[in-house]
Each structure stands twice: as structure tokens, then as C-alpha cells.
């Protein structure tokens, strides 16, 4: 998340081209030509001993002779000289460098050198970067691009060149165009942090092949996507494609889960990528998902309608008033409906009247206008009419509009007009619908992430017991545990299993069956055969002693024939579960090499292919995220919504997934968990067969997770001055109702001191931003008092760190009727300790001069107090390093 050096890279004031040349085919010539042609305002310093000047600019023989230190250096020489040149740049004090090419064998040495000099690197094997707002073309691309609001980050030079060429033809603009190359140092997460705060960037498009740090990516993407739409195209979905790209990018469903968790939207192919660029460049934000379609032909509208239906889109319903106005304005033969077919003889006036009426209504959230080539209604004339109406109408600048002028040659001028007017335009009805549904899905993802999770009921977790059982098994040399051994671990987290007994032979199996009652199930117990069904190692509905004996002997015989070297540790004996009307599910936890643990949900009784048969999520899960996973499974037909007798208990299954998530988060020794089948019968969920793979784990248990979990270790009981005890803990997404109630008990004066303005009401979005935090980026502690089965919030303090983890902005607020109990000071002391322990250097805040209580508290805690009377504020700064020394 570091931003060190990015300003010098993306907004350099001076540039040195190392290896500048006058030979047209050389990289140094191409880079100089593009820098000068791009209109860069600062000094460009060619460095070459071969020429006294390059393209009319005085050259310098070596790096040491440069008259001053450049902000940015670009290595255009033979890769064999990279390390020596990087050393010279570091000695000169240069802080950023673009490396255009370097073999993999150099990577480690280059990175060590750069870190020694605190230099940032883009590349190697980077096409470079373009920043049109700075007049900067520090790339090989001769294609000039316009200034725009879309930033593009790519890990592929080929894709970068393709997009540049495509954008030039459409006169599409960018705020930044960055080719990462091998991402040896600067990576996509840092650029997302930078672009999220960049005023020239309103949307971001990513082309990704791999990640070096999944957790940093998810954290940065989630933060940026709260303010700006981000679309991702990820190649390497198949193992063959990963081999071709020479990447180990992890499971494709894991990417889907991470992209969704971060609030991004994934596009699947190059066609969708081009549509996405058009959409992000021009489309206005959506207010909802209701689409109105206008067309001058039934067939194109039908194609759009089919695509909308296949993607589960929603048509707008016109009100009676709107329908009446349209009937009065349009010819009688036109059927007033949605889609609205104006027929192939639709004139300019028909389009204008229709648009005027629709723009004045509140019946839709987005408007799609289709035009097919027609002699009676020329496309260019209709395009002019649409653009003029949108500009003239009072609501024109607020409507989300998509245009689809079909055809190629006859529609070129119309599409050019739309691009000039800043209106999104597409070549096909299906492509237009795809673009619309991209934004609908993005909006849904964002809304889903901001929903307040319900508090799960009766969640059980005995982490200490589970740890002890796992450590004991590992100490005994176990690497895999079966159902019988896993039972107490699952029970520690409230997960139900069938009682299971171990039988060494057929006689013992008969004895156990007689004790527990018939019918029973027998299952092979072997560490070498994880899938018992492969050797017919499961026998069900055994109703007599004779059946049990025969089944046991048959299992042993089949294993000896099919797998003679397998170790057989006897049989598992279970009472036969009542499967009548029940649904069999499967819950699996796998470890992905990029994203860590994944939770998968699918149907039981099938061969397991996660890419096709499961929905996937990243832990940790809360009830909201778990419910979303279940609903996605139903929508994608990965699980059924009901069995023969009962509807699926979505809440109950969501709670079970939360329990599985808690187990995985708390117990890093678990490498893989397979619950199959999980029997769902009405509101009961029972694990019939479970396999658990385990291994010793040494290190930070949170480091293996792509999303930082709730930090339980920061909880602390505190006694206030009046003797009451309250719990200091990190804030939770589930705290939103309690936070709203807390704010209602704070006076307007205290709220004014906190927020510097009068706030009548906090929206759900406001409260979601306060409670649904990324613990890697910010921390909020709440003081809560427990009353029976509920909690009330007494005070809140929070700190939001910058991406470099140097400074944090803090704030504190205590319930107005609880002042004088020392609560504010204790909360601040906890926040100071937390920020200091996490390596931050300074804690900063502001308040008002008449907030004397806060100013006095800050002084007591060691803050430097800077009263700025002209600004009407008081600056508060705490040097955490000095605080640590004291």
C-alpha cells in the first residue's frame, strides 16, 4: 500500500532517458520522440556518450554528469547494463525508474539495489506509462491519447497496445495508462490506492494475469471501489492458459470470489473489455436497474430483450401517465410498450418527442436507444436529434443513456458524434445490454457489500479446545483425520455430526450395531483412500447382524483387491441418518496458492469439480456474506432451493457456513476440510462424513487469509470511574443499529465538534462506512456495555492510516451523558497504543477552539496543540515514536 515514489513516477517534473539515441529503431530514440511529442513540460535529459544531442536536446555522457537529479529515469539500454545503471541512479538520488526490459535472472539483484536506495521501479518488461493530463508519454507507443477520466492498468504489453489502438480510433481519453510489466516492485495495489484519490480519475480498468500479494490487492481494491467503479479482466482461467502465460495464478473461482469481495466487476473476454472501456469512459452512474428501450425496429429490440432476459435484467414499467403522453405524441400504429418500437420510418421528430416525454418521467433508471440503418430515418440525423434533446432537457445530464447505432459504415458518423458528446455508444444490441448489466452487477455488488449483516444466533466457538485437539493429533504424527476423529473439533464450533464408532473387524462392527440399533452405515477407515466410494467403501441401510458382517467382509475384500497396499484402520459405524426428503450438500475448504483458504458450497453426491459445481467465497464470512454465497449457489444452479419435502433453510445454512469460516480462521493447522455429505433436513444440518487434512503451522495465522479477520485479541475489559465495566473492542459490521442508537444519544453540540457541521441524520451508507471497515487500513474501537443479551455503545474512537502507514487521522466521540467517567481518555490510550504498535509515526486530528475538553485531553496525552484562529481549528499531532520512548 506504499505510495513512496508514485508521485515522482506519475507526475514527474523532470525525466532522464538512459540510453537515448538518434537511431530510429532504438528504444532510446522511440522514448525520446514520444516524450517530446507528448508535450511534457519539464526537462527531458538524454543520457548517452554516443551523441552530443538527441532530437535537438543536449545530451549528457553519463548519469553522474547530470546537472540535477531527475524525478524519473527510463532505462532504454541493453539489459546487461541495468544493475550498474540502477546503482548510478541510486547514488545520484533518483527515486523512480522505469525498466523496459530485464531477464528474470536479474530481478532479485535489481530489487535489492532499488530498496537499498529507496528507489521505486516500474517493470521490468514494461511498455511504460502515459499520463495525458501531464502531457506525459513515457512509453513505446506512438499513439497519442486524449485526456480522459478512465485509468487503465495492465500486466500485458500486447493488451496495452491493443487498447491504445482501439481508443485512438474512438478518440477515447484516459487519465493514466500504465503497463506494469513484471511488477517487480510497484504493483497494482499501490496504483489503486493512488488512483482512488486522483481527481482526474473517475473509473479504473484492470487487466490482470497474476498477483504477488492477494491481501494487499483485495484491501486496496475494496477501498478504491467504494468511490470509483473498477472493472477487471483476468486471463489464465484454464490451466493451459496459465502455462502459456507462465503464471501460477490460482484457481479461477478464487479470483471470482476475491473480485466480488472487493466490490469489483469482472468481464470475461476482450469484447466485454472494449464495452467496459466505453461504459466506464462515458456512462453516468446508475440509480437503479430498470431499463427502458427505444428502437426503430422490432428485431434489434428483440435481440436486446433476449440478452437482458438471459442476464436476469429488468425492464422498466411505464406509468399510465407516460403511456398516455406517448399515445398522444406518436402515430396511432405504434404500440406503446417497453421496448418501444418506433418502426423503421421513425423520423427525427418521433425521437425528439419520445425522448422529451421519457426524460420527464421517473419510470426508468437507464435508457437504451437503438437505431438500425434506414433510408427513412438517417442515423446521423437521429443522432443529432438525440444529442440536442439530451443537452436541452433539464434532466438530460442526469439520465443514464446508452446508444446502439447498428451497422458499420452508415453509423460511423453517428458514433463519432456520440463520442464527442460524451455518450456511450455500442455496435450491437447485445453488447449494449452487456454494458448495462455490467453496471447493474457492479451496483449490486456494492450494495451487497454495504448491507448490514444480521447477528447470528447461538454461535458456538471453543477455539482453545479445537487447538488442543489439532495439536495433539499433529504431535501424534497425524496428517488426516476422519469423521470419528474430527467430531470433537466440529462440535467445538457448534457443527453437528452423526455419532460414530470405530470397529476393528466385522465382529466388532456387528457388536456396535447391536448396541446402537439398526439400520446402520459402514464406512471404510483408511488414510490412503480419501474417497471411499472409489472402492465401494460405504454400505448403507444395513438392517441385520448378518448384513453388517457380510458388508464389512465385502469392504475389506474389495480394498485388498483394488488397493492392496492401502492401510486399513477398520470401519466407521454410524446410525443410519434419516434421508427421507433431505438434501445432500457438500462444503469444502481448499487452500488456494494465491488467495489462501476458500470456502466452497455445492451439491453432494457428484464428482467434485469446483469450477463447475460450486460457489466460492473467501473467509472470514459474516451472515450477510454467507447468505449471499447461498443465494448465488441457488441462482447459478449449483445447489437446489429445496428438497423433495422441504425448502432449503437459507438462514440455517448461512449460519453453518459462518461456523465453518470461524473454524478455518481460528485454526491455521487445517489445510483442507471436506464435509460430504452435509445432510440438510428442514432446519437441521448434519455432517455425515468429514475429512480433515492438517499440518503444523508456525507464524502469523492471519497472514494466510486474503481478508484480515476480526482481531479478537484486541478486546479488553475496562473499568470506568463509576465502577461500571465495559468492553473495548474493534467495531463490527453488525454494530450499525447500536451505532445509530449511540449517535442519537449524542448532543447536537458534540456532533458539531466531531463532524464540523450540523448533521440531521446519518444514512445507511454513512453508518456502513463507519462499521464495515478494513482492519488492515483503519481501526475503530467501541466501548460497549452489555445489557442482558444486547450491547449498547458508549463511545467510539477511530484512526485511518495513510497507504504508507506513516500518519493516521484520529477522532473520538463519547456519549454526551457519560462525560467525566474517563471513557474518552481510555479510548484514546487504547488507540494510541494500537497505532504505535502497528508502526505508525504520527497521529493527527483537528477540533474546534471552543472544544476545550478535547484540547485539554490532547495536551494530557502528549499531543502538540496548534491553535489556528484564522482557520477556526486546532491541529493535534502526537509523535508516536517519542510517545514510545516516554
Task: For the regions a language model picked out, list residue spans one by one.
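A structural signal for short, well-ordered beta-strand segments
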Residues: 73, 675-677, 690-692, 810, ...
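Short beta-strand element of the conserved SAM-dependent methyltransferase core
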Residues: 522, 573, 692, 783, ...
Amino acid at each position: 500500500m506504499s505510495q513512496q515514489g508514485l508521485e515522482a513516477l506519475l507526475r514527474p517534473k523532470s525525466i532522464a532517458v538512459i540510453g537515448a539515441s538518434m537511431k530510429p529503431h532504438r528504444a532510446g530514440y522511440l522514448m525520446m520522440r514520444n516524450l517530446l511529442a507528448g508535450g511534457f513540460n519539464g526537462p527531458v535529459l538524454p543520457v548517452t556518450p554516443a551523441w552530443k544531442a538527441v532530437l535537438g536536446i543536449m545530451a549528457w555522457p553519463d548519469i553522474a554528469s547530470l546537472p540535477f537529479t531527475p524525478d524519473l529515469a527510463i532505462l532504454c539500454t541493453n539489459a546487461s547494463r541495468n544493475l550498474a545503471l540502477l546503482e548510478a541512479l541510486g547514488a545520484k538520488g533518483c527515486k523512480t525508474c522505469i525498466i523496459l526490459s530485464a531477464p528474470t535472472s536479474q530481478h532479485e539483484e535489481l530489487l535489492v539495489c532499488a530498496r537499498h536506495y529507496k528507489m521505486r521501479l516500474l517493470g521490468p518488461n514494461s511498455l511504460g506509462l502515459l499520463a495525458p493530463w501531464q502531457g506525459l508519454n513515457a512509453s513505446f507507443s506512438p499513439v497519442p491519447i486524449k485526456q480522459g477520466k478512465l485509468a487503465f492498468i495492465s500486466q500485458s504489453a500486447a493488451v496495452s497496445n491493443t487498447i491504445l489502438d482501439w481508443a485512438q480510433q474512438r478518440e477515447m481519453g484516459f487519465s493514466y495508462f500504465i503497463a506494469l510489466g513484471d511488477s517487480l516492485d510497484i504493483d497494482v495495489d499501490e496504483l489503486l490506492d493512488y488512483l482512488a484519490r486522483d481527481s482526474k480519475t473517475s473509473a479504473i480498468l484492470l487487466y490482470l494475469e497474476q498477483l504477488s500479494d492477494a491481501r494487499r490487492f483485495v484491501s486496496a481494491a475494496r477501498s478504491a471501489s467504494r468511490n470509483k467503479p473498477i472493472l477487471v479482466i483476468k486471463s489464465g482461467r484454464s490451466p493451459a492458459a496459465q502455462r502459456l502465460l507462465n503464471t501460477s495464478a490460482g484457481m479461477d473461482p478464487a479470483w471470482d470470489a476475491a473480485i466480488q469481495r472487493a466490490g469489483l466487476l469482472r468481464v470475461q473476454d476482450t469484447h466485454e473489455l472494449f464495452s467496459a472501456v466505453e461504459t466506464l469512459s462515458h456512462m453516468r452512474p446508475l440509480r437503479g436497474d430498470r431499463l427502458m428501450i427505444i428502437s426503430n425496429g422490432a428485431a434489434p429490440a428483440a435481440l436486446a430483450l433476449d440478452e437482458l432476459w438471459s442476464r436476469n435484467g429488468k425492464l422498466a414499467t411505464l406509468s399510465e401517465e407516460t403511456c398516455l403522453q406517448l399515445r398522444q405524441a406518436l402515430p396511432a400504429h405504434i404500440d406503446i410498450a417497453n421496448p418501444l418500437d418506433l418502426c423503421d420510418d421513425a423520423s427525427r421528430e418521433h425521437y425528439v418527442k419520445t425522448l422529451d416525454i421519457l426524460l420527464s418521467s421517473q419510470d426508468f433508471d437507464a435508457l437504451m436507444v437503438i437505431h438500425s440503418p434506414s433510408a427513412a430515418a438517417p442515423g446521423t440525423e437521429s443522432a443529432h436529434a438525440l444529442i440536442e434533446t439530451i443537452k436541452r432537457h433539464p434532466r438530460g445530464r442526469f439520465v443514464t443513456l446508452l446508444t446502439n447505432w447498428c451497422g458499420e459504415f452508415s453509423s460511423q458518423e453517428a458514433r463519432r458524434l456520440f463520442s464527442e458528446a460524451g455518450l456511450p455508444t455500442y455496435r450491437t444490441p447485445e453488447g449494449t445490454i452487456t454494458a448495462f448489466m455490467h453496471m447493474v452487477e457492479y451496483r449490486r455488488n456494492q450494495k451487497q457489500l454495504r448491507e448490514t449483516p444480521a447477528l447470528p444466533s447461538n454461535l458456538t466457538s471453543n477455539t482453545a479446545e479445537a487447538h488442543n485437539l489439532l495439536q495433539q493429533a499433529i504431535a501424534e504424527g497425524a496428517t488426516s483425520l476422519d469423521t470419528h476423529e474430527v467430531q470433537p473439533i466440529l462440535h467445538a464450533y457448534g457443527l453437528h455430526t452423526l455419532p460414530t464408532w470405530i470397529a476393528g473387524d466385522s465382529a466388532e462392527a456387528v457388536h456396535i450395531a447391536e448396541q446402537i440399533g439398526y439400520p446402520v452405515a459402514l464406512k471404510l477407515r483408511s488414510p490412503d483412500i480419501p474417497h471411499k466410494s472409489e472402492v465401494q467403501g460405504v454400505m448403507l441401510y444395513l438392517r441385520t447382524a448378518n448384513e453388517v458382517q457380510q458388508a464389512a467382509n465385502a469392504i475389506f475384500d474389495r480394498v485388498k483387491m483394488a488397493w492392496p497396499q492401502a492401510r486399513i484402520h477398520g470401519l466407521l459405524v454410524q446410525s443410519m441418518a434419516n434421508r427421507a426428503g433431505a438434501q445432500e450438500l457438500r462444503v469444502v475448504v481448499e487452500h488456494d496458492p494465491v488467495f489462501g483458504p476458500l470456502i466452497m458450497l455445492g451439491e453432494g453426491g457428484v464428482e467434485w469439480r469446483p469450477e463447475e459445481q460450486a460457489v466460492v467465497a473467501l473467509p472470514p464470512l459474516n451472515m450477510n456474506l454467507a447468505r449471499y454465497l447461498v443465494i448465488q449457489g441457488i441462482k447459478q444452479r449449483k445447489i437446489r432451493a429445496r428438497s423433495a419435502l422441504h425448502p432449503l433453510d437459507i438462514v440455517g445454512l448461512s449460519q453453518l457456513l459462518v461456523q465453518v469460516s470461524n473454524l478455518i480462521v481460528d485454526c491455521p493447522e487445517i489445510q483442507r476440510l471436506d464435509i460430504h455429505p452435509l445432510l440438510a433436513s428442514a432446519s437441521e444440518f448434519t455432517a455425515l462424513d468429514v475429512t480433515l487434512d492438517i499440518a503444523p503451522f508456525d507464524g502469523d495465522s492471519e497472514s494466510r487469509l486474503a481478508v484480515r479477520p476480526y482481531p479478537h485479541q484486541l478486546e479488553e475489559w475496562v473499568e470506568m470511574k463509576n465502577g461500571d465495566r465495559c468492553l473495548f473492542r474493534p467495531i463490527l459490521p453488525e454494530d450499525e443499529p447500536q451505532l445509530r442508537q449511540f449517535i442519537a444519544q449524542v448532543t447536537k453540540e458534540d456532533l458539531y465538534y466531531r463532524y464540523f457541521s450540523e448533521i440531521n441524520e446519518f444514512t445507511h451508507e454513512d453508518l456502513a462506512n463507519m462499521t464495515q471497515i478494513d482492519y488492515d487500513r483503519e481501526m475503530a474501537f467501541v466501548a460497549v456495555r452489555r445489557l442482558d443479551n444486547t450491547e449498547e455503545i458508549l463511545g467510539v474512537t477511530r484512526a485511518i492510516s495513510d497507504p504508507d502507514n506513516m500518519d493516521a487521522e484520529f477522532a473520538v466521540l463519547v456519549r454526551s451523558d457519560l462525560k467525566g467517567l474517563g471513557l474518552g481518555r481510555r479510548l484514546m490510550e487504547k488507540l494510541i497504543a494500537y497505532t504505535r504498535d502497528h508502526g505508525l509515526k504520527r497521529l493527527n486530528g483537528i477540533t474546534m477552539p471552543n472544544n476545550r475538553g478535547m484540547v485539554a485531553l490532547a495536551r494530557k496525552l502528549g499531543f502538540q496543540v496548534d491553535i489556528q484562529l484564522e482557520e477556526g481549528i486546532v491541529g493535534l499531532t502526537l509523535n508516536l515514536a517519542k510517545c514510545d520512548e516516554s
